[in-house]
Amino acid sequence: MTKNKNNQTIWGTRISKGASTIFQKVGSSIDIDKRLYKEDIAGSIAHIEMLFRQKIVSFKIKNKIIYGLNKIEKEISNKKFEFNKKYEDIHMNIEKRLFQIIGEEAGYIHTARSRNDQVITDFKIWIKSATKEVNISLDKIIKNIIQLAEKNIYTIMPGFTHLKNAQAVSFAHYLMAYVEMFYRDKKRFT
């Protein structure tokens, strides 16, 4: 498990006995959350920028941390970063590497920010990005359905009510019902 500078695990500074292998496997999320590396780095850069603007860290420290974070992002993007399960999650893997690159100044990334803040920030940044991708896909689907509807204004199809035959309808009208549903879905994402 990850240890702090006093060589104690992050999760158990009051626990003298080490965690079991099973607990370590259950507690490690790096296999899942390593895909959040861009969000984690972006959140840390934004945080250190805020600390600089609030005059909590110097220009030199800010730049040193940003340099280290950018280097880590390149390493991960180029598949030269070795994720380690013993560091539990994406945050600790990045933090450990940042300490290796820039030294003790890496500790400033936690000034005025808890690990829970870091986790939720990463997740919100990821959700925003994923939502944007969904909206782009919905726009493409809507566009294609509208084009198909325009070609089928005079195409008649059987209508159904509760899976029983109902009044005949235009295929275009039927398709436009889906366009409205997708517009509703899009509103829910924004």
Residue map of PLM features:
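A helix-coil-helix interface module used to build multimeric assemblies
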Residues: 2-190
